[in-house]
Amino acid sequence: MTWFDYSLEPKSDIAFIDMKSFYASVECVDRGLHPLKTSLCVMSRADNSTGLILASSPMFKKVFGKSNVGRSYDLPFDVKTRKFSYYNARKQGLPTTIDYVNYIEEWAKSTVIVPPRMDTYIAVNMDIQKIFQDFAAPDDIYPYSIDEGFIDLTSSLNYFVPDKSISRKDKLDIISAAIQKKIWRKTGIYSTVGMSNANPY
């Protein structure tokens, strides 16, 4: 049997960066609202009972228990009146106690519902791509979608963190944090970063 020493494999330092609730965050920032504390959803045809929820803020998801994609009729409140929907609640097995009804209606009143603006999201994405280029060459940046992508920071580690006493893992962590901070300062968007020594292809 032939044994292979994987420690001899080339090392690569990859950061996978994901913008947190990107569309909803862009809409919040554009309105001077906190993207993590505001209940907001991006909905097409909000005037229609079958309006499509394209994106939502973390607070919206927490309060109403919904993911990014869904229909307005899946919500526990009526989009037009912002009143509790007993029909939807029963259909989904949700409680109908007075406390829960009041809770939903209070949040429904303050929830911001906006139409999608793809041109705006693309423009913010371009700003973020420029930030990536402050940390890596264009050939080392691999967009995955409008709100996430890989950056190969292998060639950048020692340039940004030349201290030889710091491990590659810690250097990757330092640079990733710097990227997150710059994205937030430039766009107001929060992001998450996953790091590894793997090939992004």
Describe each model-derived feature in a short phrase.
Residues 1-201:
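Gly/Gly-Pro- and Ser/Thr-rich, intrinsically disordered tail segments characteristic of DNA damage-repair
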